[in-house]
Every structure is written in structure tokens, then in C-alpha cells.
Amino acid sequence: MAAPAPRPLVIDTHWLLDLWLFHDPRAQALDTALAEGQVRWLACAAMRDELARVLDYPALQRAREARGLGADAVLARFDQHACLQPHPPASPWRCRDPDDQVFIDLAWAHQAHLLSRDRAVLALAAGMGRSGLLVSADWPARPSS
């Protein structure tokens, strides 16, 4: 019997920073899941562009320098693990933060679990959940409400 296909997952920028810049222990299980192919992380070019942009924020530049980590190393991890998708069509939900909209739209387009620590995204979790989408701030997933 074939192994089940890894479940699709959309990961926001906050989580990526916790994974690869801050090495937050709460992100360790996700890092393992990505490395072992337990999830299929879906992303698009706009998400990579946002990560590149925020890595250049002064506070994050200092954090990278303190860890001896270049932006290119973080972006290489993105490129290694992300399954790039075309830019998604608009979903039924509108996020207060336009930078976060693409994460919602991609999750909707692929019926993927959306992993986010962003308040504007999490504020939409209940409505998205009623449409069958799992939105959570935690990994392993616990639905946000």
C-alpha cells in the first residue's frame, strides 16, 4: 500500500523566521516535518519576495548578523523546501494586512492548512474553518478560534 500523500501546508513569514532565523524550539517539529517530507509546503513567488523584504528590516538584519546568517541562507532554505505554485486567485476572505492576503488565497486555492502567527490572519480563522480550512498558530495543528 502506498504511503499517503503529504498534506498541503501554507506557512506564513512569522513561522519561517522562527524556523530558520530564531530557531524557536516551538518550530522544531515543523522543521522535522519539512525535512522528512511529512508535509507539502506550498508557496508562491510573492511569499518569497516578502521573506526577502522582511529579512532586510534593520532588527532582522541585526538578528541575522548576531547569528552569522545571511539572507541568502534563509532564502536557500525556502527554495529547498517550498513547492512553488502560481499566484493564487482571490479567496472569499479579505485580510486587514494586504501582505498576508496571498497566504490566505493560496491556502484556499489548494484547501491547505494555513500555519500563521499573524493576528490579522488568525482573526479570519473561524470563518475559514466553517469552509473546511484549518488555520492554526501552532504546529502540530490546533485550530485557532
Which positions does each model-derived feature cover?
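Short, well-structured N-terminal submotif of metal-dependent ribonuclease cores
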Residues: 1-43
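Acidic, PIN/NYN-like endoribonuclease modules and their adjacent C-terminal/linker elements
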Residues: 97, 101-104, 108-115, 119-145
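Alpha-helix capping/helix-boundary segments
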Residues: 15-16, 47, 120-121
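PIN-domain endoribonuclease scaffold, especially VapC-family toxins
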Residues: 32-90
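Residues at secondary-structure transition points
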Residues: 25, 42, 69, 94-101
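Glycine-rich, phosphate-binding/catalytic loops in enzymes
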Residues: 26-29, 59, 131-133
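Residues that scaffold the ATP/ADP-binding catalytic core of kinase and kinase-like folds
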Residues: 19-20, 54, 63, 124-125
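Short, flexible loop segments at the rims of nucleotide/cofactor-binding pockets, characterized by
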Residues: 17-20, 64, 89-96
